[in-house]
Amino acid sequence: MAHLPLREAEDLYHVPGWGDGYYRITGQGTLAVLPLGPNGPEVDLHDAVQVLSEQGLGTPLTLRFPQILEHRVDRLNGAFHKALKDNGIKDVRYRGVFPIKVNQRKEVVQTLAKAGRKWSYGLEVGSKAELIAALTMDQNRKSLLVVNGFKDKAFLEAACEATHFKDTVVIVLDEVGELEHLIPLLDSVDRKPALGIRLKLRSKAPGKWALSGGERAKFGLTIPEVLYAVEALRQAGHLDRLQMLHFHIGSQISDIRRITQAVREATRIHCELVKMGVPLRYIDVGGGAAVDYDGSGSSGSNSANYTLEEYASSIVAQLKDVCDESGVPVPDIINESGRAVVSHHAVLIVNAIRKVPHLVLSPDEEPHDDDPTSLWNLYYTYQYLSPKNVFESFHDAVQYREDLQSLFDLGHLSLEALGRAETLFRATLGKVRDILAEEEETDTEEFEQVASLLSQKVVCNFSLFQSLPDVWGVKQQFPIMPIHRLRERPEDTATLADITCDSDGEIRRFIDLEGTKPTMATHDLRKGEPYYLAMCLVGAYQDSLGDYHNLFGETDEAWIEVDPARGNWTLTRSSSGSRVSDMLEWVRYSPADLKERIRERVKRLKDRGHIDAETAKSLTARYTGLMESSTYLEPPRAT
């Protein structure tokens, strides 16, 4: 086993880049989480998984750190308060709200609500169910409740009645047709909510969520529609309730310039409306604060070229600049950051089940006399491969392989000869890989292609569609790495496959110091020794979007907190994952009925003499017992 220096291990998995002070590699070669930030005590994930295993919690296992949620709430609110102070802005409040859709789990929202009480940190909802959930939270009454999304009469009525629970409820007009229900409702209620208008800005962000902004956005009012809404509210006598402008140009906005551009455009509209007599008090800059998943600090789609502090400072500075130019007071600032608040708190731990290698065999003989020219050319390419001709030889080998496949398809090459050709091709790739590695040419396109062609597959005990749906849905990349053996130099590269019966259930792109790569570095699997991988920063959207493909259900879950004084960690909450019976019931099978049907079928087999009494008893126990087991595979037995 080759030793790997700590600095090289950090570079290999780029932990200092994406960890943001919450993750680090220990001197013992394990991955640790620091729930209180870089200066607080740490939780060794490998130790934690072993302890939790003894308590009956197995992999796949979701670990949650509520103190990270608290730390992120403090950091976000503190950043805006500091930005207001640094810009000399007085009598203006920052009024952050958490969009429940980003993570709707009760314990997550409760933790955020409790942490936000001192900041009057509020909630944003987009459905009737989310509204009810928000109203049950123990929050500061002065915190805002922002109601977005499409709304019918019942939803609008419930939002209006929410003013009994909150001092300020803001109902946002997401499309102009909502006025038809809203104006009569305002006429009939005593406790009237504040109103907001979502703008359809010209500004937009590139990338996966580009259609959230711009003129073709799903939500929002155009300028003519805004003016129409203002006039309609004026004529109805409710213009005093229009107190907020809102915009949202997308999630994971990696380039700060896109944010400042949108803020300037929206603030200009705000100022013009104020001059027209609209009593606006708030500007809601939406969400979009990005998470630096790959740690590059760039404007790439999986990164962010700014910190939370720079995000807040840029927004406040742009607001002040435009308002000062227009002679309009700076409004209170609302933002709806969700991803940036909850991503870091959750880690999915999975165990490797097995490796599926691509065999690279040495050719044991030269081609036959009657073999085609392309096979002989491939053989000579292999024989005379050197550092001087490595790139040319690689491309030649790829072409010869294609030629030979065409000959086989046309019936001019035997299966045996095609097998020898494939063995020769893979042996050539192996030599190319070794030469490029020795020559430090690993950042080339050719090396990436070779690594991909020769990569192994590590099958892991999880469902991509349940736990990391954004990898499949929007090609999101998350930091993934082993949680132990990090001071051992990994000898292999691999992709990661889940246990669903779906070819899309595979992770084929991984973060890298220079961007992304088609494989990740992995160690050999030792017989009888579990090999654990961490899939980090999975706290945003994955819980809400995960589905039950192949009827794989929720994972086991553990909530962990650290004691700042003692430095130790404690399991504060845990839950077992879905059972087979849970998932069958979810698709409308009755577990009791299924068990009875199994008993009937077994009895029929026994009565007909197909099985004896002992086998009948064993079959019944097997299948009824299986229904109470986990939907995932048995505890780790890495081989």
Q: Which stretches of residues belong to each language-model region?
A:
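Flexible glycine/acidic-rich beta-alpha junction loops that bind and position SAM and/or redox cofactors
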Residues: 203-207, 281-300, 334-349
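Low-complexity, highly charged intrinsically disordered N-terminal segments
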Residues: 26-104
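Conserved, well-structured core domains of diverse proteins
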Residues: 1-58, 561, 569, 580-583, ...
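Helical (often loop-to-helix) elements that flank the catalytic cores of nucleotide-handling enzymes
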Residues: 300-315, 364
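Charged (often Lys/Glu-rich) extended helix/loop segments that serve as interaction or gating elements
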Residues: 314, 320-639
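Active-site-proximal beta-alpha core segment in soluble small-molecule metabolic enzymes
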Residues: 88-284, 291, 295, 305-310, ...
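A non-catalytic, amphipathic alpha-helix used as a structural packing/dimerization or gating element
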Residues: 67-75, 228, 265, 314
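Short, glycine-/Ser/Thr-/acidic-enriched flexible segments
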Residues: 30, 38, 68, 103-105, ...
